[in-house]
Regions:
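Start-of-domain marker
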Residues: 1-64
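Functionally constrained cores in energy, signaling, and assembly domains
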Residues: 13, 19, 88, 293, ...
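Extracellular/lumenal and peripheral-membrane lipid-interaction modules
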Residues: 20-22, 273, 350-356
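Glycine-rich loops and low-complexity Gly/Arg-rich segments
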Residues: 27-29, 40, 308-310, 330-333, ...
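Mature, soluble, non-transmembrane domains
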Residues: 44-339
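Juxtamembrane interface at the cytosolic side of transmembrane helices
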Residues: 340-360
């Protein structure tokens, strides 16, 4: 993703999306596809060759697509050679962020943005911020049930650095510990998702030992027991045994087997954590003037680049912040003019004073 911020507050956003024959030759983007980005009305589509900054309007002719396909040969796809770009202009950063094309779990990512101008006479500072709302509520079992907040932040976002000054062997040992905790959290949520399906069919449970609300309230305790097992070896029979023991009843056993889920529910379960691990992109930001604070991003050749992934706003909001400075040339001109005028006035005043003094 490329974001260009202008001095007047307007901005442009460009994202790169995967293109196939249909998109390239018709210009119609399939928003029903499981992709991070969704293109609504108002976006202009372009295509360009990989490694080339040239842009060409979409749609391209079918003949052009076939020509490119022949050029790349049978062993490669056109999408490996041709990129598709979607571009949109905005009047303000606020409008741009409110219209974010990025989606997490079928919901538009919550993004608040702003551009503040701080006037300093000889220069003006531009402060760009973009804040992503936390997705913690998406997961029924919080990660802090299995890891400390610091551990989770380091594992999913890379900060804070918990290994400063530690030897490599210790680093490896701690990472293994974190991985085990993170895996247990993942499987705890999957188990919760699976078992909460029983609540959706609670009217079909024969002689339930507790009410539906009480069943849901105890699910986190149940999945914590299940999380103590090796996820790769946990079988449905074990899950049934744990639940029967916890509730003192076999009433839920018929709902815990491989055939109980519909195809849609099975696909939803498969995608449940896919959203967390597949939501990933780099955002490059071009600011007016010279960047004086990259805010943790990587600054190179006038561009600040941040990696945006769901892990960074798993626990709390994630903010991007870049500060740039524009020199107000006119301020130097005005200051120089005022200084010259003042100098002339002082000299002229002295000459007038000397003239009248000489006449006395």
């Amino acid at each position: 993703m490329l974001t260009i911020v202008n001095e007047d507050g307007s901005c442009m956003r460009e994202i790169r999306v995967e293109g196939d024959r249909s998109l390239l030759t018709t210009g119609k983007y399939d928003n029903d596809d499981q992709r991070v980005a969704r293109i609504e009305d108002g976006w202009e589509l372009y295509w360009g060759y990989k490694g080339d900054n040239s842009r060409f309007h979409i749609p391209m002719s079918a003949e052009k697509f076939d020509s490119i396909s022949r050029e790349v040969g049978p062993s490669r796809a056109v999408k490996d050679t041709v990129y598709v770009y979607a571009r949109k202009e905005y009047a303000s950063v606020e409008d741009m962020c409110a219209g974010s094309p990025m989606f997490f779990a079928d919901d538009q990512t919550g993004v608040d943005g702003s551009l503040e101008k701080e006037f300093r006479w000889f220069y003006t500072d531009y402060v760009f911020t973009e804040k992503f709302s936390s997705v913690a509520d998406y997961f029924s079992v919080p990660v802090t049930d299995y890891m400390s907040e610091e551990e989770a932040s380091y594992w999913f976002a890379g900060t804070p650095d918990l290994y400063a000054g530690k030897p490599i062997w210790r680093y490896y040992e701690l990472l293994e510990d974190f991985k085990e905790k993170a895996d247990r959290w993942v499987f705890a949520n999957l188990h919760y998702k699976l078992l909460s399906g029983i609540a959706d069919r609670y009217d079909m449970v024969v002689e339930p030992p507790v009410s539906k609300d009480e069943f849901v309230a105890q699910l986190r305790d149940v999945v914590k027991q299940l999380a103590s097992y090796d996820p790769s070896k946990l079988e449905y029979a074990t899950v049934r045994s744990v639940i029967s023991s916890h509730f003192g009843s076999d009433a839920y056993s018929p709902f815990i087997n491989e055939d109980v889920l519909s195809d849609e529910e099975d696909e939803e379960l498969d995608n449940y954590f896919g959203y967390l691990f597949l939501f990933y992109y780099d955002e490059s930001i071009v600011m007016p003037g010279r960047v004086i604070d990259a805010g943790g991003g990587i600054y190179k050749d006038g561009v600040v680049t941040f990696t945006v992934d769901a892990g960074r706003f798993l626990l709390k909001d994630y903010e991007i912040r870049v500060v740039s400075r524009v020199v107000n040339v006119w301020a130097f001109v005005v200051t120089a003019a005022l200084a010259s005028a003042l100098f002339v006035a002082v000299v002229y005043r002295k000459r007038i004073a000397a003239y009248f003094k000489g006449r006395h």
